[in-house]
Amino acid sequence: MDRAVFYLRIFPGSEAEYDRRHAEIWPELVDEIRESGLRNFSGFRRGTDVWYYTEAGLDVATALAVHGPKPANQRWNRYFRDVIAQITDDSGELLWYDEVFHSGGPPLDGPFERALFGLVIDPDRADDYEALHANPWPDLMEAIEASGFRNYTGFRRGAHVVYYGEFYPDMTTVFAKMAAHEVNDRWGAAFEGIITTITDADGNLLAADEVYHQD
């Protein structure tokens, strides 16, 4: 299973319209997304910044390449020409984030919340950030699983990192449980000087609101 995140930016003032159009997308577009092999496809918006998390059986890039020329998708893209300000780089590639961390865990029953939040690192310490996540401590991984994180995955693009997760029963409860584990403080201390921004002025995580989901 391949996991991926890409980014887009919408025009200021178009936030409500972007959300409205995604509240109920066209049935023919839903069919095309499924035919292309994309699964667990979720969009999250914070202001004019939007991130999409998705999965595919082989690889997401191939599935999106299959999806791109489909007729409903072409009409959908044109429909957003006055809403989306940027979705590709100068070469025409989507603005991908690279996966740097993943935690799975056995399936859990009951309700859960899909969520995405971001943080900023010192770009000069990007190698240190990735090295720590390439070999996470066993007791950290145990605490993550025990706290109710599932499919918890980090992605980086430059100095910006986003985390997607499925939180049982919700993100607030899961992070409160995680904070009770001693390893959480040690892990946080390891990133002093690496992570420069992780909360807003009120101390809240920089979370984005889910505006779209398709299984």
Located regions from the model:
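Short glycine-/aliphatic-rich beta-strand segments at the starts of folded cytosolic domains
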Residues: D2-A16, F112-D127
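Short amphipathic alpha-helical segments
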Residues: S14-L38, R125-R150
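Tyrosine-centered aromatic motifs in long, intrinsically disordered, low-complexity repeat arrays
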Residues: Y18, W26, F44, W76, ...
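Short acidic, gly/pro-rich beta-turn/loop elements at beta-sheet edges
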Residues: Y18, Y53, T62-L64, Y129, ...
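Short, glycine- and small/hydrophobic-rich beta-strand elements in well-ordered beta-sheets
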Residues: V30-D59, M141-D170
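An amphipathic, aromatic/His-enriched active-site/gating alpha helix that lines ligand/cofactor pockets
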Residues: E32, S36-R39, G57-E93, S147, ...
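Short, low-order "capping/linker" segments at domain edges
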Residues: T88-P107, T199-D215
